[in-house]
Amino acid sequence: MTSVTLEAAPDAWAEQDAWADRKQFINPAGLEIAYVEISGAEPALVLVHGFTDTSRSFSLLAPHLAGRRLIMLDLRGHGASSPGKGFGIADFADDIAALIRHLQLDQPVVVGHSLGAMVAIALAARYKELIGGLVVMAGTLKPDFASDHPLVAGVQALRDPISPTDPFYDWWHACRPGVPQAFLAGLANDASAMPAARWRAILEEICRADLTSAAQGVRTPTLIIAGGCDPLFGEAHQQALWRCLAGARLLRAEACGHNPHWENPAFVARAIIEAFEA
């Protein structure tokens, strides 16, 4: 695919069919990492998606951040990025550090959703000098999923080839009315391209993660965005984040579930802009 940085065009960037064609690639240490870039004002925003998603996860948010430089990557093993040899939180964080250095980003604000929020915390702890701000959206320090949790049970039941119409997606991508069906279909197609064994391998790493110590060492200005109806990481998880991330501000998207940037992207964009452009 041609490597090209495009100017922001809100309506076009929210369109789904051509999303994969917008990806560029870097190859740090032999691992190919895909990303989508929209040019704009600095500091850049580095947007890190959740488990089984891709850079597409931020396609509804991007138009509301028009005028700002956006870097939206596919985590290793997701989308068009190579799987590499490990799926630990630190592995993902190291990849993002390599991307920041490759693009010579100056103190970007890193916005992480769900798994991406966990990765962003690890990044801020491991590479303090690289980032200028942190947004932890629908995140957690320690998922602590029981063996009968719907996510664990649902992933264990998946078999290749995974269908984009598998009933599991009705739960996994559940959100309030109004989220475009073309967007949700694109997410399901992206996720279904991942082998079931990779779903399970990544989820195992998520389940064993504990970012408490890492979060306690973060000194980056931090905004926590919590979905008021989040079925995965509810109020107890958000309070734990707030206690451990020194000086963090906790903001609730009251009517949203686990995906505030899909359900109310204007709210999320406004929160990010107000937090880091004040």
Annotate each language-model stretch with its function.
Residues V218, I224-A226:
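Short beta-strand/loop motif that positions the catalytic acidic residue
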Residues L31-S82:
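Conserved HGGG/HGGXW glycine-rich cap/lid loop of the alpha/beta-hydrolase fold
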Residues I121-R126, I131-P161:
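Flexible "cap/lid" loop of the alpha/beta hydrolase fold
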Residues C256-A269:
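Catalytic histidine-centered segment of alpha/beta-hydrolase-like enzymes
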Residues M1-L45, A66-R68, L105-D106, A193, ...:
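Alpha/beta-hydrolase fold catalytic core
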Residues D91-P108:
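Conserved acidic catalytic loop of the alpha/beta-hydrolase fold
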Residues C229-F233:
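Acidic catalytic loop of the alpha/beta-hydrolase fold
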Residues F145-P150, P161-G217:
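Conserved alpha/beta-hydrolase catalytic His-Asp/Glu region
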